């Protein structure tokens, strides 16, 4: 399922043009590429559930969103998000890329993935996908994109 999310993000979602996508033909295309139908449906369902936040996240952002808080992770969350992942989420909060609300959306979407443990690289993709899909998070998305993809270039110069 995770590979499908990355594939969709790189080939469909991140595309600036807003084309209407026929889910049946998309499912067939993904199946033809070699993805399993069950994983395709799970990935599309994951994205559909993410779209539920599009309407609710912006009004719910409160004045405390920019304050750094300590998130206590449940045992299940700690198993799926290792120390590096939890540290990276805190790092993004400190950079004000994530708010309390977007952090919670990201954690909730991660918990819905059908994987046992997320690695740091996969977490970065999930954060990009979530921020890209929530209206009002464009600035945070671009900050993260610059941080992730321009970091090596900045070191060289």
From Swiss-Prot:
Q: Which InterPro entries match?
A: Smg
* A matching Pfam family: DUF494
Its family remark reads: Belongs to the Smg family.
The record, for PANTHER family, names:
PROTEIN SMG
Instruction: Output this protein's name.
Output: Protein Smg
Q: Which organism is it from?
A: Buchnera aphidicola subsp. Acyrthosiphon pisum (strain Tuc7)
């Amino acid at each position: 399922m995770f590979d499908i999310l990355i594939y969709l993000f790189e080939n469909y979602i991140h595309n600036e043009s807003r084309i209407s996508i026929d889910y049946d033909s998309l499912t067939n295309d993904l199946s033809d590429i070699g993805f399993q139908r069950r994983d395709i449906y799970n990935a599309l369902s994951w994205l559909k559930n993410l779209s539920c936040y599009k309407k609710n996240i912006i009004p719910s952002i409160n004045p405390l969103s920019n304050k750094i808080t300590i998130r206590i992770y449940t045992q299940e969350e700690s198993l799926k998000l290792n120390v590096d992942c939890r540290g990276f989420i805190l790092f993004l909060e400190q950079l004000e890329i994530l708010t309390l609300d977007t952090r919670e959306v990201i954690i909730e979407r991660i918990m819905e993935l059908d994987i046992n443990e997320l690695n740091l690289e996969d977490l970065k993709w999930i954060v990009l996908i979530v921020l890209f899909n929530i209206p009002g998070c464009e600035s945070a998305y671009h900050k993260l994109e610059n941080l992730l993809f321009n970091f090596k270039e900045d070191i060289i110069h």
